[in-house]
Amino acid sequence: MLYHCVYFWLKPELTAAQRADFRAGVETLKGIKAVAKVSVGTPAATTKRPVIDASYDVALIVECKDVAAEAAYQVDPLHLAFVEKFKTFWTRVQIYDSE
């Protein structure tokens, strides 16, 4: 299994409606057939510790069966449409891929 973990830092000036639209956009990625599972979340209210980075706004965890499935996800029309529509909403994106 390959885990494609994406963390988004949204522009602070986005309205609540824009943030909700972004979240809905991330949820559309669940429709990509190449992936096994898509999870979306925000920083958890866990105990604050120096090793925890909760500065991001939205987390996206995409589970793919292998590297080929992750490559298919990258070029899927739903993913490309999401990036095109929302690329102006974030100030930073950080990705961690692991197997």
State where each predicted segment sits.
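An amphipathic, aromatic/His-enriched active-site/gating alpha helix that lines ligand/cofactor pockets
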Residues: 20, 24-36, 54, 63-96
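Intrinsically disordered, low-complexity segments enriched in polar/charged residues with Gly/Pro
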Residues: 15-16, 49, 60, 82
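Absolute protein N-terminus
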Residues: 1-2, 99
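A general secondary-structure junction signal
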Residues: 39-44, 97-99
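Short, well-ordered beta-strand segments in beta-rich or mixed alpha/beta enzyme
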Residues: 2-10, 46-74
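N-terminal first-folded block
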Residues: 2-40
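Residue-identity detector for threonine
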Residues: 15, 28, 42, 46-47, ...
